[in-house]
């Protein structure tokens, strides 16, 4: 299905995207625009394809030979689905945070510095500054500044997820993908992540997958509702939740789905 937003700047343009797990047709003719420096949410029931769509945006599926995408995904006008796309550079520009916190088995400091070292050669002073900058952006600096050399595993679940966000933005990407980042967190940690998402859009284009419709309503500027691999409706978030155009969307957001 084709749905585009009316905005002066689109960071990502998805055109006629189809995706396959082997012979299974998981995404069907998806077309949508993702606006720069805004938060776009993908919602829908389990198995609808929202996480699959998210993972096409940095070609995460290429880790699995049986998975393939067809169509076009334009990032700043360049089609990332071509064979010429440098995967390492793509993932530097399009960072990802997963459902469960995934700190590396190393210190808090090195969790942040690890990715930076892959792309930049910084002096120790500059690296210290980058680590502080990333942790500050992720609202974690005050909680970690006196224990940077402790293990990332020493942090609470909510802190670990903010560490993963800090790690993702440390390499200064353009886009940040969040795959259900709060599903394993308590309400207080969830609230802090949601506040952080609102702050991050000042500097990044943010795309979030969530099962929590209230979270999508609170955090996002645009929302896409998906069902069985199809894009059913895509609009600004207020419109989708208060005046949906499609009955399927209305049934889902009012709890009459199924």
From Swiss-Prot:
Q: Oligomeric state and partners?
A: The complex is composed of two ATP-binding proteins (PstB), two transmembrane proteins (PstC and PstA) and a solute-binding protein (PstS).
Any Pfam family the entry gives: ABC_tran
Q: Where does ATP bind?
A: 44-51
Q: What is this protein called?
A: Phosphate import ATP-binding protein PstB 2
Query: What gene is behind this protein?
Result: pstB2
Protein family membership:
Belongs to the ABC transporter superfamily. Phosphate importer (TC 3.A.1.7) family.
Q: What are the EC numbers?
A: 7.3.2.1
Q: Describe the function of this protein.
A: Part of the ABC transporter complex PstSACB involved in phosphate import. Responsible for energy coupling to the transport system.
The UniProt GO MF terms for this protein read: ATP binding; ATP hydrolysis activity; ATPase-coupled phosphate ion transmembrane transporter activity
User: Which PROSITE patterns has this protein been placed in?
Assistant: ABC_TRANSPORTER_1 (PS00211), ABC_TRANSPORTER_2 (PS50893), PSTB (PS51238)
GO cellular component terms, semicolon-separated: plasma membrane
Listed under catalytic activity are: phosphate(out) + ATP + H2O = ADP + 2 phosphate(in) + H(+)
